Amino acid sequence: MEQEVRELMVEQIKDTFSAEKQALRCMQKAVRKASTPALRDGIQMHIEQTQVQIERVEQIMESLKVRPGRKVCEAMRGLVEEAQHEIEEHEKGPVLDLVIVAGMQRIEHYEIAAYGTNIAIARALGEQEAVGLLSETLEEEKQTDLKLTEVTEQYIMAAALEGGSGETARRGSQARSKAS
């Protein structure tokens, strides 16, 4: 039974590696579309952080004597595709920034769940080095999620409600006018 759990850990770590690589590519595209400086800065910081997180996952794979192979995290693929599709639906501006935050937070929440599971499995198997590396990344993912919420509340939301961009903003202001 322990061997099955160890194999599960290997598959989960490979999945996490794929997820981080996909998230990194998504962020690299999103940072170019963001218009709020605090959001751009936050995404850029998390891009750099994600590169380190990928290195940590590589360290874990090395300690487990496995390679990532061709494993693709299908859940992350779906989250990234959805985020990219939604980003393409909006013009640059505060509403697009909200869309970027929404997509990034869905990705962060997936990563938080994945790292939590990975930590539990690694801990049960006595893989303390992996537990330490995974825990460090989990904390960073939680902090990124909080920062995204903070940037939204402090900078993006008011601008989106005031003007927004494109058709989405016009529909929102028409709805507010009718409600008045």
Give names to the regions the model predicted:
Residues 1-180:
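Amphipathic alpha-helical hairpins
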